[in-house]
Swiss-Prot record:
Function: Single strand-specific metallo-endoribonuclease involved in late-stage 70S ribosome quality control and in maturation of the 3' terminus of the 16S rRNA.
Gene3D superfamilies (alphabetical): Metalloproteases ('zincins'), catalytic domain
Cofactors named for this entry: Zn(2+)
Similarity comment: Belongs to the endoribonuclease YbeY family.
Compartmental location: Cytoplasm
CC cofactor note: Binds 1 zinc ion.
Entry EC no(s): 3.1.-.-
Record-given protein name: Endoribonuclease YbeY
Keywords, ordered alphabetically: Cytoplasm, Endonuclease, Hydrolase, Metal-binding, Nuclease, Ribosome biogenesis, rRNA processing, Zinc
Domain of life of the organism encoding this protein: Bacteria
Pfam families: YbeY
Cellular-component GO terms for this entry: cytoplasm
């Protein structure tokens, strides 16, 4: 496996990230303005995603569609929402009338032929900040750590990872732990570790 701390190795990628958030008014007593700014900083998330791509693309045996391995331009959506909204989406799309922490909607079509330098749509990741906040308290780590955990989980789903068995879930969760250790080069990286 590649040394994840070797910052000299990088894949030249462009990520078009659409970042949307919900009104944090409901959680203003729980989350300070500095954390809200960090959560909603598009560059922070884009840098994390690029570092995760670096990690995946340098390891040819990992699950990743060939169209992704051949492309360098990607588009995806990241939506932060609340429990009520994610419950409605979960009910509509997965027929489960309950809130959840993360949903992902992969959009990759392996058979599409893209012109050079065309953006490949990966899909969308939706995360409930309310659930992430609760889970961060349960696991005794920061909200930002939990959000990165959930976004990395959704990201792997966009790339075709799944966990129908406990063995595949354990493999996916172990790889998520590696992804979270990759340096992301963000100027806010030190701030991310403070939370």
């Amino acid at each position: 496996m590649q040394n994840l701390n070797d910052s000299s190795i990088s894949v030249d990628l462009t990520i078009d990230l659409s970042l949307s958030g919900f009104t944090f008014d409901l959680m203003k007593d729980s989350i300070d303005s500095k954390m809200i700014d960090l959560i909603m900083d598009c560059d922070t998330w884009r840098n994390s995603i690029v570092s995760w791509f670096d990690c995946i693309l340098m390891q040819p045996n990992l699950t990743c569609p060939q169209i992704v391995r051949k492309n360098r331009f990607f588009s995806m959506g990241l939506l932060f929402t609340n429990d009520l909204s994610i419950r409605q989406m979960n009910k509509e799309w997965r027929k489960k009338d309950e809130s959840t922490d993360v949903l992902s909607f992969p959009a990759i079509d392996e058979h599409i032929v893209l012109p050079p330098n065309q953006f490949l749509e990966l899909g969308d990741i939706i995360v409930s900040v309310e659930t992430a906040f609760k889970q961060a308290k349960i696991h005794n780590h920061s909200l930002m750590h939990e959000l990165r955990w959930l976004v990395s989980h959704g990201f792997l789903h966009l790339l075709g990872w799944d966990h129908p068995s406990s063995a595949s879930l354990n493999e996916m969760l172990s790889f998520q732990e590696l992804l979270l250790k990759t340096p992301n080069g963000s100027p806010l990286r030190n701030s991310m570790r403070d939370y």
